[in-house]
């Protein structure tokens, strides 16, 4: 007897099959018999992204198991393999476990029990963010570093800054990379409050704000069966909750093997669901994660309801809401050395940058967030920094005092 693991919006379940010689049609019949999901409602795939599909029309994109006569052995499915299942409608569970009575004639219910029973975790169908568009230069600078310099061996992250339109479209125009320690399976931000004040002052002058967080996954994670790990969910939920911005975007950069055996870099933007952010704010997540914990499951301190079950572990995919991705050419360049990387930025770098762009108007030469952040160390954060950034936003004449200061800094190298 062969056992297949079936993951759906209700969590992880098991289906017993006669062996890998059965067809997709026979597998669907077994799922109907054992999990009570009608055959005509089922969509099966070996692609975990099926669980992120929002509507039946989205299910149509997953065709690897669409042929009812296909033998599952041809999909390399064997004992213990994972199959992803999406279905329409509700399901009826028969033969459920015995229930311990609660209330007046059974176990005494606490306030926490009542709250937990009301805390139902389901898939959020629609994001607050309609789409996210990345400035090509800043996105390329980030992915190039994690690909070429870090080889996707350790994690790297950055805060995304830009604008949010009235209809929920997010535009990312620069990425600030805070001090951090990246490891194979974790990312520790060593945030510098003074530096972040300068970043926010620049954003203010540019008419922008913090709109999200971006990080890469490492190559060792590519073999795991999750979209975000439990550690990544915790960090994403923390930063989303801190932002108080409902359109806040979490973007993941990953390396994936293409059909030709080569590697492609992919950007995947999400929003953490409202329920995920609420659970984090209210302290439901277990924050101590051990090496024996399953990375695709988030542990909670109390039970919540997922589908028809009371659970203390939730599939991370339940907390993710897909966001459409676009790109654009923003108003800033991205050629100045980026902060907090392997080498410290020096006055020599400023001189090289200014000389290389000497044919351009002065305001164009300084229209780079990373240059502005470097210069901001020597300016008043409450007045000079936003004033200089505003010149960049308006592409207006830069006051002579700022121009002289920047030129003198460059000439000290």
Curated annotation (Swiss-Prot):
- Enumerate the InterPro entries for this protein: MPN, Npl4, NPL4_C, Npl4_Ub-like_dom, Ubiquitin-like_domsf
Q: Does the keyword Protein biosynthesis apply?
A: no
Q: Which UniProt keywords apply?
A: Phosphoprotein, Ubl conjugation pathway
Q: Where is the MPN domain?
A: 131-272
A biological process term (GO) from this entry:
proteasome-mediated ubiquitin-dependent protein catabolic process
Q: What's this protein's name?
A: NPL4-like protein 1
* Residue numbers carrying Phosphoserine: 104
Q: Tell me which family the UniProt entry assigns to this protein.
A: Belongs to the NPL4 family.
| Function of the molecule | May be part of a complex that binds ubiquitinated proteins and that is necessary for the export of misfolded proteins from the ER to the cytoplasm, where they are degraded by the proteasome.
Q: Which domain of life is it from?
A: Eukaryota
List the PROSITE patterns. Answer: MPN
Q: Where are the transmembrane segments?
A: none
Q: In which pathway does it act?
A: Protein degradation; proteasomal ubiquitin-dependent pathway
CDD domains, alphabetically? MPN_NPL4, Ubl_AtNPL4_like
